[in-house]
Amino acid sequence: MNELKHLAVVMDGNRRWARAKGFLAKLGYSQGVKTMQKLMEVCMEENISNLSLFAFSTENWKRPKDEIDFIFELLDRCLDEALEKFEKNNVRLRAIGDLSRLEDKVREKITLVEEKTKHCDALCVNLAISYGARDEIIRAAKRVIEKKLELNEENLTQNLDLPLDVDLMLRVGNAKRLSNFLLWQCSYAEIYFSETLFPSLTKREFKRIIKEFRNRERTFGK
């Protein structure tokens, strides 16, 4: 049985879920947050130590301003809730991505939650904000060069935002692509594609996907 330590999820389909039900996109994102909370619960129940969530990509900056503003308003509320609940539930928050593009108040709140939860070890939630895998790799290479280290696989890995291999990449929303998420870390990850839109995912389906992964045969290229 495969051990699942690091689950990465591309949370796609929030807008399509809302449109299909005749709602504004905002409601899709709000429902997506509820699904994200269910996923965190499943990870703790299944002893998964790292959960990486693709919240906002570098490409998402091209979306309409009012949509971007709402996403960050929602993020702000989520961070407030994280301040209240994460430490109590022994959950750590770690933000990855080009955070320099965020407003100061958002960065400050992220730092506050990261600092308050850095000792928590039941689950680490790696929240990808303003994130793109190619951008992460370029920034990691620059760090290696600035430190005057040899540019090799080990040094590049250690200078990534998240130097942790992914075991299972879950892509939801009926799209079969990686969307520039954790490409380096997914070198030998198993991939599961789900047709379900993210807001519609249930704990039962999450657990079924995890069970299917644990029964796969992993060869790591051998």
Curated annotation (Swiss-Prot):
Subunit structure: Homodimer.
UniProt-annotated catalytic positions: 12, 60 (proton acceptor)
Stored InterPro entries: UPP_synth-like, UPP_synth-like_CS, UPP_synth-like_sf
Annotated keywords: Magnesium, Metal-binding, Transferase
Superkingdom per UniProt: Bacteria
EC number: 2.5.1.-
Any one GO molecular function term: magnesium ion binding
PANTHER family: DEHYDRODOLICHYL DIPHOSPHATE SYNTHASE 2, DEHYDRODOLICHYL DIPHOSPHATE SYNTHASE FAMILY MEMBER
Cofactor(s) needed for function: Mg(2+)
Binding of Mg(2+), residues: 12, 190
Residues binding substrate: 13-17, 57-59, 61, 63, 171, 177-179
GO terms under biological process: polyprenol biosynthetic process
Protein role: Catalyzes the condensation of isopentenyl diphosphate (IPP) with allylic pyrophosphates generating different type of terpenoids.
Record keyword tRNA processing present: no
Coiled coil: none
Name listed for the protein in its UniProt record: Isoprenyl transferase
Binding note for cofactor: Binds 2 magnesium ions per subunit.
Listed Pfam families: Prenyltransf
Stated family: Belongs to the UPP synthase family.
Entry keyword Magnesium: yes
